Amino acid sequence: MLDYCLVVTGPAYGTQQASSAYQFAQALLAKGHRLSSVFFYREGVLNANQLTAPAGDEFDLVRGWVQLARQHGIELNVCVAAALRRGVTDEQEAAQQGLPAANLQPGFILSGLGSLAEAALSSDRLVQF
């Protein structure tokens, strides 16, 4: 059994990166491996935007990540600098930056690159999408 860390750099919609990462995560968990952390970086931070509203016949990837994380104890870390540049923030950062609202999907955590470094060091495999 291997411990994995995923890095997602593509948005929830518009490219295949995030969807492929989600499917990969499901597959490795089904095979008995462990997924300790998913780090969302660059455009990948858009996976944490709770204001996405996919069509009724589309898979809701944002909420899919949260459900997967709850079921398997996975940390969903979002790069705070990349998130703020792209308009994704939690209540605390919104207040610090003087922004009118927050939109970070509950279940995701704003964090720095240090959390990615820690996850990379403690996992057996790091896979980037």
Curated annotation (Swiss-Prot):
InterPro entries: DsrEFH-like, Sulphur_relay_DsrE/F-like, Sulphur_relay_TusD/DsrE. SUPFAM superfamilies: DsrEFH-like. It comes from the Bacteria. Part of a sulfur-relay system required for 2-thiolation of 5-methylaminomethyl-2-thiouridine (mnm(5)s(2)U) at tRNA wobble positions. Accepts sulfur from TusA and transfers it in turn to TusE. Belongs to the DsrE/TusD family. GO terms for molecular function: sulfur carrier activity; sulfurtransferase activity. Its EC number is 2.8.1.-. This is Sulfurtransferase TusD. PANTHER family: PROTEIN YCHN, SULFURTRANSFERASE TUSD. Pfam families: DsrE. Gene3D superfamilies: DsrEFH-like. It is found in: Cytoplasm. GO terms for biological process: tRNA wobble position uridine thiolation. It comes from Serratia proteamaculans (strain 568). Heterohexamer, formed by a dimer of trimers. The hexameric TusBCD complex contains 2 copies each of TusB, TusC and TusD. The TusBCD complex interacts with TusE. GO terms for cellular component: sulfurtransferase complex. Keywords: Cytoplasm, Transferase, tRNA processing. The active site is at 79 (cysteine persulfide intermediate).
